[in-house]
């Protein structure tokens, strides 16, 4: 059983992110932000964003937390914009 803290540090989450990065890399070898459509260049700038917000009550529902269709790969800055942190 996960809580949000342990989920985002889990091997399951890390493996899913690595898989999504490989799957979503285009023919030019670029990974594109699914929010602003600009290239994701720096490894530390790539965030896996859940379209349906992950909460303590749904983190263990893998149809939400580990569903590739529920995850966007986006810039750190874009993630902050989505969550109104600017």
Task: Please name every model-derived segment.
Residues 3-4:
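Active-site-proximal or metal-binding-adjacent scaffold patches in catalytic folds
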Residues 8-22, 55-60:
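Short Cys/His-rich Zn2+-coordinating modules
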Residues 10-11, 61, 67, 85:
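Polar helix-capping/helix-linker motif
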Residues 14-49, 77:
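Short cysteine-rich loop/turn motifs with clustered Cys
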Residues 25, 51-53, 80, 84:
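Positively charged, low-complexity intrinsically disordered regions
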Residues 30, 46, 58, 81-85:
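Generic macromolecular interface patches on structured domains
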Residues 41, 68-86:
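Short Cys/His-centered divalent metal-binding micro-motifs
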Residues 52-70:
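Short linker/helix segments within small regulatory modules
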């Amino acid at each position: 059983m996960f809580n949000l803290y342990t989920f985002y540090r889990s091997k399951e989450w890390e493996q899913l992110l690595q898989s999504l990065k490989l799957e979503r890399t285009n023919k030019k070898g670029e990974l594109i932000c699914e929010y602003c459509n600009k290239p994701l260049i720096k490894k530390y700038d790539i965030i896996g964003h859940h379209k349906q917000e992950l909460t303590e009550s749904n983190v263990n529902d893998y149809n939400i937390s580990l569903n590739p269709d529920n995850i966007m790969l986006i810039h750190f800055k874009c993630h902050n914009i989505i969550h109104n942190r600017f």
